[in-house]
Regions:
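N-terminal periplasmic "start-of-domain" segments of outer-membrane beta-barrel proteins
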Residues: 25-57, 83, 91
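Extracytoplasmic beta-strand/coil segments of soluble accessory domains associated
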Residues: 63-105
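Short acidic/polar hinge/loop motifs at secondary-structure boundaries
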Residues: 102-129
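Periplasmic-side early beta-strands and strand-to-turn transitions of outer-membrane beta-barrels
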Residues: 159-163, 169, 176-302, 530, ...
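C-terminal beta-signal and adjacent terminal beta-strands/loops
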Residues: 205, 460-463, 529, 647-696
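Face-selective signature of the C-terminal outer-membrane beta-barrel domain
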Residues: 233, 238-246, 303-449, 453, ...
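Outer-membrane beta-barrel signature, preferentially recognizing the C-terminal barrel domain
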Residues: 290, 296-311, 318, 441, ...
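Gram-negative outer-membrane beta-barrel transporters
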Residues: 367-369, 410, 518-528, 545-628, ...
Length: 696
């Protein structure tokens, strides 16, 4: 766990402002695990970003925002996409939630699809690893990321508040504006937020970008999002609803989709004309700024639209023996369009209805627990000349129970979950599949002393294959009929005969804390049978690499370390030292290394924090990844220097926050081994960032 140092509760998309150093670790109240009150009370591996720490780390993508946590990394696909990688696992093995319900986007379908969650609107982000993920599906073998944004007020605010923020990001010449308002009238609470972001092509290290330039072409982004929510509060609980929307347009770096313009079918259109259209975006201005040295030739862009409706009810003690009932219903209309130049390649659509209902029962002796049911119905389609996944209807039913038991210095936790997945390709283009999966976990935490705790857990998880793993290019049996996925410039071949993926996880941790410091270390292993892997076959068809979903045994082993300590004081400000490191290794039964794993990584930070200001210097480094997997490219070692300062000014009862930081101060060329585009798209170069916020 990390020591959390926050002086105030601020709007978390705004600047971090002044973070006060308090003695001892602060405990975050968990939303994702209803049984537990804080991160210190669970045997499960849990991390939470809140307050000033969240504001400091917030980025435009979810993966980049939480990449500072131990064991968590970012799988970028250009600056517009950042998917979380937890303990080496990603994609369908990591479940992204928004207020406890699935984000219901297409991020699990492909690495080029963004997670339809806006981190800059978050109040907190909770990351669960290990057995706790059973609450949200046995398929979340890697972990669960829950973004809590308060769009449905769970309590009546004491007074009306208005927060306005602005942020400038130097590397992308991007500007983000946010507004948030909350208030109450009698027993009704209200919430409103909105965000607008525009950025140009991102700058990278000298000579590392498009055609040897210092920028990545076609990486501009435009995003608008917001939500409107309300809740009615009564003696025994509340009921609330919210509507939210997301409209985003982002480009995939030039070079990442070479070969995709040769025609949508691998064996056809060998002399396909390249599109030569300009996009009405910030890309054009930025191209001119860099001398107009690159042109768009069928650049691939993704236009994302999502409309979401949420209903939530909490009832305290609805009947004898039940402490709390929690009900969640979410309706999502998601669509994104892959554009090549001005032409539509594929339109992805996902319409889903999901319900989740929990009962927290009263203690039975020393046993306390939660049980529930989760149901969903999703229609997914990919339409267009370049569509390579058939329309499918997916129905899911899940039953789960999680119990804990306290006995002296021991706390035990046990969970069980059963899921049934029906996946039905529309029109009979492939065989329908039904999967029954059963997952179980057992964990314990032992209090050695007031300062020392040791924890251990073991779980057995099962995951049903996903739609893209089963049905990508289904029915296209010859190379001439294979369809290239334009956004990734690859041919992706599914396997409708895939079996259930099974994993056995073991986790051992040691945690220490005192009034001025905290440290934790964990070691873990994941042993899979029927592990599903999108393997690079090494075959090239029509200039596109052929990747195939294959299945076999695999094993991951890893370790994490995290520590924070207050060294002393200087001019009434606390001097802090922060350390972190993690490593994971993965190998298939064939002896090949698992591709796109992060290398040995670490960070070291020196901080100085007072009541009204905060300063930091941080070095983050990654070793060379010389075990990239079969037919994959290795990456070099890298390091990054970040420095910054944050200040808070009071104007009566109102606060003004200002933050200034320099990220990648030495303009290093950084290529992440977790990125599918590491050969084409390095991470952003030197970036001078400025943020301002006003809290009324």
């Amino acid at each position: 766990m990390s020591v959390r140092r926050t002086l105030y509760t601020s709007v978390l998309w705004a600047s971090a402002a002044a973070a006060a150093e308090t003695s001892g670790p602060l405990e975050h109240v968990l939303v994702t695990i209803p049984l537990h009150k804080s991160t210190m009370e669970t045997a499960f591996p849990v991390d939470a970003l809140t307050g000033a720490e969240l504001a400091r780390e917030t980025s435009s993508t979810l993966g980049d925002t939480i990449a500072s946590l131990p064991g968590v990394h970012n799988a970028s696909f250009g600056p517009g996409v950042g998917q979380p990688v937890i303990r080496g696992l990603s994609g369908p093995r990591v479940t992204s939630l928004q207020n406890g319900m699935r984000s219901a986007d297409a991020s699990a379908i492909s690495a080029d699809h963004s997670v339809a969650v806006e981190p800059m609107l978050a109040d907190s982000i909770e990351v669960l690893r290990g057995p706790a993920t059973l609450l949200y599906g046995g398929g979340a073998i890697g972990g669960v990321v829950n973004v809590v944004d308060g769009r449905i007020p769970t309590a009546l605010p004491a007074e009306a508040t208005l927060d306005v923020g602005w942020r400038y990001t130097g590397a992308s010449h991007g500007q983000t504006g946010v507004i948030r308002a909350e208030g109450a009238i009698d027993n009704f609470a209200f919430h409103f937020d909105a965000l607008s972001r525009n950025s140009d092509d991102v700058d990278v290290a000298d000579g590392a970008g498009t055609d040897g330039m210092d920028y990545l072409g076609n990486t501009s982004t435009q995003t608008q999002s917001g939500s409107l929510g309300a809740s009615y509060h009564f003696t025994d609980g509340f009921i609330g609803a919210a509507m939210s929307w997301l409209d985003s347009d982002y480009g995939l770096p030039e070079g990442s989709h070479e070969g995709s313009h040769e025609g949508s079918h691998a064996g056809g259109h060998e002399d396909g004309d390249e599109d030569d259209h300009d996009h009405e975006s910030g890309h054009d201005e930025h191209a001119e700024e860099h001398g107009g040295e690159h042109e768009e030739h069928g650049d691939v862009r993704l236009a994302v639209d999502q409309l979401r409706y949420d209903v939530v009810m909490h009832l305290h003690q609805p009947m004898n023996g039940i402490e709390l009932f929690r009900g969640f219903i979410t309706l999502t209309d998601y669509e994104h369009t892959e554009l090549e130049g001005d032409e539509i390649g594929t339109v992805y659509s996902s319409d889903s209805l999901e319900g989740r209902f929990e009962l927290l029962h009263a203690p039975i002796g020393d046993i306390h627990g939660v049980m529930g049911v989760q149901v969903s119905d999703t229609n997914f389609s990919a339409l267009g000349d370049e569509a390579f996944i058939p329309e499918t209807d997916t129905r899911r039913l899940g039953l789960f129970v999680l119990e804990d038991w306290h006995a002296g210095d021991w706390q035990w936790e046990a969970g069980l979950r059963w899921d049934q997945d029906h996946i039905d390709p529309v029109g009979g283009v492939a065989a329908r599949r039904r999967f029954n999966t059963l997952s179980a976990s057992l964990g314990t935490i032992y209090e050695i002393s007031a300062d020392w705790h040791v924890s251990a857990s073991v779980s057995r998880s099962e995951r049903a294959p996903s739609t893209e793993e089963l049905y990508s290019n289904v029915g296209n049996v010859t190379p001439e009929s294979w369809i290239v996925h334009a956004a990734t410039a690859a041919i992706e071949l599914g396997n409708s005969g895939l079996d259930i993926e099974r994993g056995v996880n073991a986790d051992l941790g040691l945690r220490w804390h005192s009034d001025s410091a905290e440290a934790s270390v964990a070691v873990y292993s994941n042993d899979f049978s029927n592990y599903i892997n999108l393997a690079n076959t090494g075959v090239i068809v029509a200039e596109a690499p052929v990747r195939r979903y294959v299945q076999g045994g695999a094993k991951f082993v890893g370790a994490e370390f995290d520590a924070k300590v207050t060294l002393g004081a200087l001019n009434s400000r606390d001097i802090g030292l922060e350390l972190g490191a993690d490593v994971v290794r993965g190998e298939l039964d064939s002896g090949d290394d698992i591709p796109r794993l992060p290398p040995l990584s670490g960070s070291l930070a020196l901080t100085l924090g007072g009541e009204m200001d905060y300063y930091f210097t941080r070095v983050t480094a990654g070793s060379a990844q010389d075990r990239p997997g079969a037919n994959e490219e290795p990456t070099n070692s890298w390091w990054r220097l970040d420095v910054g300062g944050e200040w808070r000014m009071m104007m009566g009862a109102n606060a003004v926050d200002l933050a200034l930081s320099l990220r990648n101060a030495t303009n290093e060329e950084i290529r992440l081994s977790t990125s599918w585009l590491r050969e084409y798209a390095p991470e952003p170069g030197r970036s001078l960032n400025l943020s301002f916020s006003l809290h009324l």
